[in-house]
Amino acid sequence: MERAATHFLRLHKSGISALCSGVIDPDYGITSPVLFSGDIDGEVTIWNLITRRPIFTSKICNEQVVDIQFLEGKYLSLLCKDHKLRLYELLKLGAIVKQSDFGGGDKVDLKQIFEVPVNTLNFANYVLTYLGNNKFELVTCHTQDAHFIDIYEFETPELNSLKRFSKAIDFLPMLRDRFGDNLLPKMDGLGIIMKFYKVNEVVYCGFESGYVIAFRRYRNKPLYRKRVSGFIGKPINECASGISKLLQHENVETSSSVNDLELDNVIEIVLVDRAHYPDPVLDMAPNPKKNGIICSSTTNKLVLTSVDEQYLAGPNSAYIFKSDEYLLDKKNCLLMSTNLKIDGSAVKDMMCKNIGFVLSLGDYIITGNWSGKTYIGRIESDKAVLAAAKSRSLIEVNESPVGNIQQDKSIQKSSKHTKIGAMTGFEVKDKEPDKLMCKNKELTPGKLRRLNAFVQSKWYFIGYTDGTIGLYRAE
C-alpha cells in the first residue's frame, strides 16, 4: 500500500541531487537531527528535522552536488561536478547559534577548511574517514582514469598536507592471475567504478561490470612476508604479477622461516563477488544483518554480500603472512589470500527494475527506481510493496504565444511520477534515543515530546527532481 509523505520540505529551486542525515555535536547548540541537501545548481541546505525549517543555505558552487557526507557531528564534505571535494567545519557555538530553544531561530554556518581536486567524470562517489587529530583518509577514483583507485591522507587546516599513499590501484591483474578466464568470460575488464561504500574498516567498490570488490588498508601497520618454498597455485608466466615468480628458484633450506620483506600501507582484497555481473552496480547500502552491503543494479534484483570473518582478521595478530598463502603484486601494495574465492551472494527480488537507489533502515530495505517509484520490504522477507510515488503535474506549461494543435508525443511518453534525485534515511540505534534525550533535558515538555516521537521512528527521505524533499516513515 502506497504511503503518503508526512511532510514535504520546499526551498530548493532545482532538482535534489544529494542527501545526508545526522546529528550535530551538542556543543553547537542544535538540539535536533538534521538533514543536508544539495541540488543540481550547487545549492546546499541544512534542515532542522523537528521544526522542518532550514538552519543554513548557501550556493557552494555552480555545478551539481554529487555526494554529501557528515562526519563526527561537525565535518561536512561535499563532492561537486566542478571536480572538487570541499570539506567544511561547523563554526564554534558562540559564533553561530542564536538560542531559541528549539525554534526556527537556530542557525549554523560553515567554514571551508580543505579542498582537493577529484575526478567526477564518472558515476562514483567517495569515502572520507576521520582518523583523529584533524587527519582524514580519502578513497576516490584515480585522477585520470575512473577504472582505478587513489587513496589520500590530509590534515586540516594544512592545505599542503595532501599525500597520496596509493596511486591508480588496479585489481584486475591480480584477479586474472588468481581466477583466470573464470573472472570475466563476457567482458574485457571490470569497467569504471560506480560506487564506494565503507563498512567498518572495509571499503566496497561496485564496478560497471557488476562485480563488487572489497578491500582493507593496513595503515601504519607493517606487514611481514615469511618466505616459503614453492609457488602459489598454478605456475604464473613472466608477464603476470604476483610473488610466485620470486619463489620459483627459492632455496628451501634458507627460506622456510625468514621474514624477508616489510610492507607499508598494503591494500588487501578481502571479497570478490560477481554480484550483478554483467549489469552495472548502481547503488550500495549497509546490510546490518551480515555486517556487509546491499547493492542494486538495472535488474529487479538486490544482492546481499559480506566479507567472510576469516578475511576480516587479517594475516595474523603479528601481521605476518606466508608467501604460499598470499598473492602479492609486483608493486608490493596489493595482497590477496590464495584461498579467496569468487562469491555468489544472496539475491532478493524487489519487484522493480533500474534500482538507482537503495537504503537500509534496521531490517527494512527501501529502493527507488528511475521512474520515481519507491518500494519497501524487509531483509529476510521475499515481499516488497510500493511505498511512495510522487505524482507530477500532467499539465505542460507552454510559454510560447503561438499554440500547437498537435499533441507532443514526448509528453505522452514521459513518466507520470516525479523522478528521484537522491535518498537517505535516519534511525537512532540501540540506546541512542535515551542518550539524545539526555542531551536535551533543558527543552520544554512539548518540545521533548516532539523530539522523542521523531527518534522513535525510522525515517527515509526522498529528494525529487522538482526540488522537493519527502519525509516518510518506514514503519
From Swiss-Prot:
One of its GO terms (biological process) is chromatin organization. It comes from the Eukaryota. Transmembrane segments: none annotated. It is found in: Nucleus. InterPro entries: WD40/YVTN_repeat-like_dom_sf, WD40_repeat_dom_sf. Keywords: Chromatin regulator, Nucleus, Repeat, WD repeat. Belongs to the WD repeat ASA1 family. Component of the ASTRA complex involved in chromatin remodeling. This is ASTRA-associated protein 1. It comes from Candida glabrata (strain ATCC 2001 / BCRC 20586 / JCM 3761 / NBRC 0622 / NRRL Y-65 / CBS 138). The lineage of its organism: Eukaryota, Fungi, Dikarya, Ascomycota, Saccharomycotina.
